[in-house]
Amino acid sequence: MSELNFVVDREKCIHCGKCSDDCATGIIEFDREGFPLVKSGNEQYCMKCQHCFAICPVGAISICNKKPEDSDICDNNLPTDEQVLNLIQHRKSIRNYRQENLDKATMQKLKDMLKYSPTGCNNHKLHIALIDDIEVMNRFRNRTNNTIKKALLSNKWLPVSKKFEKFKQQFIDGKDVIFRGAPHMLVVSVPVTAPCAPVDPIILLSYFELYAQSLGVGTLWCGFAEIALKLIPDLCQYLEIPDGYKVGYVMLFGKTDLKYQRATQPEDYDISVIEPHEIFPATFVDKVKRYFWNALR
């Protein structure tokens, strides 16, 4: 038994090799009898993705103290491609919310799905700050808005005042410019050392949004809240974001009375379908331009 607790039930194993074929780091080998194993010293390379565990057709593999009998079975009861596309086409950014909490059952479903969001290299170390109570949200909302309003009136806190100067009068008038009256909020932060730090929070929130909207819950990607969190340290402390983590992005959510009657008609993106051709070296000028564009935010 290794540090990973990679265990093979020899009574069940059919020697199909699927666990080894699907191992992302290629550390699953076979002993002389054809049973899979992870050699001592290779445990450190395991991503703990559990693919070997999931793909075994007979449930012969346990890893990381996970037992196959404790997992749901994939029954292929998936939505059709038309149903998935319909969900994508009809999702909308919601800026008008009921002033009430989600029911506990719906909130629990949303919490439970978060762990299934993939992360780069299966880092799986995101921090999620969840406000699931409207009273807590209102306290956070008021603190944020009052801090920004004070900065705008004094013109002393330049990073904050510059970012929100355009909305100064709305803050003065008490408008909820940032949070749009949302009763709930999800803030995803990521370790600064994570291999795919920029995208991991976005992946999680993309999964969260589609699942939330399938439950009739409105969502909003909130760049203003992300800016506020990055400029006002008190807010990060309130959300218990650990040291060594940076705010990735923010999503607001809650029930809404808005009912959209049809899908929008967005313009197509510019898609370059690449045909077979030689790859020629870029000129010096083209290299400089590309380095410049890739380095921008």
Regions of interest found by a model, annotated:
Residues 1-297:
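Acidic, surface-exposed loops and disordered segments
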